[in-house]
Design a protein with these regions (language model features):
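Short helix/strand-bridging catalytic loops that position acidic/His residues to coordinate divalent metals
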Residues: 78-80, 97-105
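Acidic/His/Gly-enriched intrinsically disordered linker/tail segments
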Residues: 112, 116-183
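A broad structural signal for alpha-helix termini and local helix breaks/kinks
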Residues: 53-56, 96, 100, 126-127
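Post-HEXXH active-site segment of zinc metalloproteases
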Residues: 59-66, 71, 101-120, 125
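Active-site recognition of the HExxH zinc-binding catalytic motif
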Residues: 49, 85-101, 112-116, 120
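Hydrophobic helix-coil surface modules that form long, contiguous segments used
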Residues: 1-88, 117, 165, 176-177
Length: 183
């Protein structure tokens, strides 16, 4: 298909090949660069992933532009954009739930929970900094968030701080609502 580009990245020291298939946008080199970065990031993080979560047992993995966000399948992910967070998260589903074979409908925490935990560690490794540091720096300049600032500074474990990112964004947006449960 002339509207799509297919990039292939062989990961050094591994038998894994990364395929990136995306819609070509003439004149938008930033689009090409963003999608090309997926293979480079995969090559950088795979040794860390395999050291911490086990060897990737398949010969290839494909990131395919399509769908409406991110949806993992065996050896492939449909993603709408080249977001590295989504790329890493969906790829880690190859370990949690696919290799473990858990029933993601019956035990969603084993699927999304372990994947999100692993994503936080891999993302932190890739960016080589605490993902919470950005919030700490932002909150230091916002006296209206004193309670949240104290929480960030003294309570949260830095090693797994990325798991709190979505919640902090929600709190800072002013759109937070009370939790509703059936109980």
């Amino acid at each position: 298909d002339p509207d799509y580009r297919h990039l292939v990245k062989k990961i050094a020291g591994s038998n894994t090949i990364i395929h990136t298939i995306y819609k070509f946008k003439p004149g938008k080199t930033s689009n090409d660069e963003a999608w090309a970065k997926i293979g480079d990031v995969a090559a950088e993080v795979l040794p860390f992933i395999e050291k911490n979560f086990g060897k990737y047992p398949y010969p290839q993995y494909s990131f395919i532009q399509g769908g409406d966000g991110g949806m993992e399948y065996p050896m492939a992910t449909l993603i709408h954009t080249s977001s590295l967070g989504t790329v890493i998260h969906e790829w880690l589903h190859s370990w949690y739930q696919m290799m473990l074979g858990t029933n993601e409908s019956l035990y969603p925490w084993m699927d999304e929970g372990f994947t999100s935990y692993a994503e936080d560690l891999v993302t932190k490794f890739y960016y080589k900094r605490s993902s919470l540091q950005e919030y700490r720096d932002t909150l230091k300049n916002r006296p209206d968030n004193k309670t949240l600032k104290e929480l960030v500074e003294h309570v949260l474990p830095e090693d797994h701080s990325g798991a709190y990112n979505s919640y902090f964004r929600l709190v800072q947006s002013g759109q937070e609502e009370a939790l509703t449960t059936h109980s």
